[in-house]
């Protein structure tokens, strides 16, 4: 890949069994493994891509969703550029737990400005016909909790998987653009010669 590449850390959070590992593997390797076991602690994979002319290396972190693994996963939240909150559309409890996952991430990642941090919401397993969470419910949650982008995905058949991760990159880039603008307005030019000053002795 030509050109300078930025490294973005993206973390997948959500209940155990919602398909976080499958989503990561589908996106990075374009494979789906029906025998995938629950993650213990954390795992990550890298993916090089170009989004809107920006070359990016996305470091995707997959975390264990079970409560007993909390102490293993939370140290890895820091330094994340984007968080993909994930639930399964056939599991209403995993949807109800999104708020808890968001709070846990904000606390352990030490997010300074939660209202502007880029979250993307994924409703996974739309290939399953019996759903417990409607599209409208999920969209309403996203509107009420920060106007987050929402994608209904299937790691099994790859529906919207690439689109969701690419949107995560766009959100990070937009956040960086805002930060750069703020920084540029307050920078000090170290190369500018100081104005001569007069003093009386």
Curated annotation (Swiss-Prot):
Organism in which the protein naturally occurs: Homo sapiens (Human)
NCBIfam families the record matches: small_GTP
Lipidation (S-geranylgeranyl cysteine): 200-201
Catalyzed reactions: GTP + H2O = GDP + phosphate + H(+)
PROSITE patterns in alphabetical order: RAB
UniProt GO MF annotations: G protein activity; GDP binding; GTP binding; GTPase activity; identical protein binding
Annotated function: The small GTPases Rab are key regulators of intracellular membrane trafficking, from the formation of transport vesicles to their fusion with membranes. Rabs cycle between an inactive GDP-bound form and an active GTP-bound form that is able to recruit to membranes different sets of downstream effectors directly responsible for vesicle formation, movement, tethering and fusion. RAB9A is involved in the transport of proteins between the endosomes and the trans-Golgi network (TGN).
Positions annotated to bind GDP: 17, 19-22, 124-125, 127, 155-156
Name of protein: Ras-related protein Rab-9A
């Amino acid at each position: 890949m030509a050109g300078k590449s930025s490294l973005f850390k993206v973390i997948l959070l959500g209940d155990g069994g919602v398909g976080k590992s499958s989503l990561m593997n589908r996106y990075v390797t374009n494979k789906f493994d029906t025998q995938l076991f629950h993650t213990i602690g954390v795992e990550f994979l890298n993916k090089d891509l170009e989004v809107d002319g920006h070359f990016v290396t996305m470091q995707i972190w997959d975390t264990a969703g079970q409560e007993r693994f909390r102490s293993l996963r939370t140290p890895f939240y820091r330094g994340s550029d984007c968080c993909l909150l994930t639930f399964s559309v056939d599991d209403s409890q995993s949807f109800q737990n999104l708020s808890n996952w968001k709070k846990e991430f904000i606390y352990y990642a030490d997010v300074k400005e939660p209202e502007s941090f880029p979250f993307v919401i994924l409703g996974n397993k739309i290939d399953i016909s019996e759903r417990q969470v409607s599209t409208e419910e999920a969209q309403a949650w996203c509107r009420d909790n920060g106007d987050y982008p929402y994608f209904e995905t299937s790691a099994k058949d790859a529906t919207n998987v690439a689109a969701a991760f690419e949107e995560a990159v766009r959100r990070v880039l937009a956040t960086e653009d805002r930060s750069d603008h703020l920084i540029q307005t307050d920078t000090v030019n170290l190369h500018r010669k100081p104005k001569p000053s007069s003093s009386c002795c």
